[in-house]
Amino acid sequence: MCLLRLSALGDVTHVVPLVRTLQAAWPPVRLAWVIGKGEHRLLDGLAGVDFIEYDKRSGIAGMRGVRRELGGQRFDALLQMQVAARANLLSAFIPARRRIGYDRSRSKDGHGLFINERIPDRPGIHVLDAIGSFCEPLGLKQDTVRWDLPVPAEAFDWARAQWPDDGRRTMLVSPCSSHVLRNWRPERHAALADHAVDAGWRVVLCGGRTALERETADAILAAMKHPALDLVGKDTLKQLPALLARGELLVTPDSGPMHIANAMGTKVLGLHAASNPARSGPYSDRRYCVDRYDAAARRFRGKSADTLKWGAKIEHEGVMDLVTVEDAVAAFERYRRDHG
């Protein structure tokens, strides 16, 4: 069986419970997974899975390379879990008898031309549950959600070495998503972080190595009254899950780290206005999310969120300004009330 999901970090994290469901039902099954480069680094070592890496920059030549790497094998089933045009075209280079794709409401970019079966059309569900339903045409049901991400012991050792075990509670801040319009203002992050420090918490900034992430972290640090530990750009994708597991609470917009933290059992204070947390928020627990999606729909679309197509993004300039510092502080205090 072959899985096709190239990106992004959060979405491939959502695929892992499906892998666990397939493996639990059919223990001998060997899965091939065509995946993106960075996403492969995150999930490398996932037991029972043979990864075939596809570089999005490689175009048709890279697609031919995937076919060569598959060695001429024809799969009983291809689970085509990405509807973007590039992924649809890539799927044509993967020989398979059953080609299972998304329902019509989630399809786009000619997705239906590359598949011969569809998952059930179930509106109003989380992205993880939609991905989990890819096992249903195979006669299975994803009743249990289990991740167990492949994190090496050295990654946990690295995370433990970043700050002392002194009993101080730790709030992680991962301020950047893959789309700049989902990001919250640095000065608002700083205000929430200062509130946490005033409450006795340690604040740790984390993120990748892009210029935007560095600039955002610097702006947060400059606006804070208190010091914070700056780990932005200092971890690897293998160390990231261990780092997120070490924190007690993660503050982040809709982002890959949100879903990785959730998979590692860390609670998330999600900042939502551009996207619907019921669809793409932290899967296990959304009690500490700020949800201004309906306010965004009314402001920028002139209608309530429940009248929009499920999954509609409201990525407009200024949309995240609907999330106030007071909203985030209230969510933080909600967490403190529930967890002592």
Which stretches of residues belong to each language-model region?
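Catalytic machinery of carbohydrate-active enzymes
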Residues: 1-340
